[in-house]
Amino acid sequence: MADTSDFRNGMTFIWKDDLWEIVDFLHVKPGKGGAFVRTTLKNVKDGHEVEETFRAGAKVDEVRVERREHQYLYEDDYGLHFMDQESYEQFSMPPEQVEGREFLKEGGDVDIVFRADTEEPLRTEVPQKVDLEVTETTPGVKGDTAQGGDKPATLESGATIDVPLFINEGDVVRLNTETEEYETRVSAASTV
């Protein structure tokens, strides 16, 4: 059992028969009345966030979670399949538990968060920066870059992002998965 004085960002606990992670919290001690803690909680299973207030000293059941690196294998009707990098065990997760799946490519690394006591996979965490090949975009025309600007591009994972006009099909680009924005061109397509 933990109480509100133990709250910290990333802490996971059981509340209202569900698993929640603390995204943000603030201890408040008003001049009149009892102290309380304002929190932003994220549901571990489906990802939706709620704001909740706890009285100071309220007790919650803390749950220990572990992050382990896995390799993304493929997606089919049963879900997304992953392999543990150390034991080579494979398992699948439903798509709604896989955050950032539009940036996963087969063979790519991803961290999976497990509930330590039951070994149940809870969610995935994709790397903050990933390199993906541009599979479809309009060709850049000489002189287009004078004014700057962006154009849509489809990546090998199926995601669509805005890229600068000089990016062509076959280029490998680095993007930030948190902001879902282009960062830089890693390599240009070969024109052989």
From Swiss-Prot:
It comes from the Bacteria. One of its GO terms (molecular function) is translation elongation factor activity. The keyword Protein biosynthesis applies. Residues 133-157 are annotated as: Disordered. Involved in peptide bond synthesis. Stimulates efficient translation and peptide-bond synthesis on native or reconstituted 70S ribosomes in vitro. Probably functions indirectly by altering the affinity of the ribosome for aminoacyl-tRNA, thus increasing their reactivity as acceptors for peptidyl transferase. Belongs to the elongation factor P family. This is Elongation factor P.
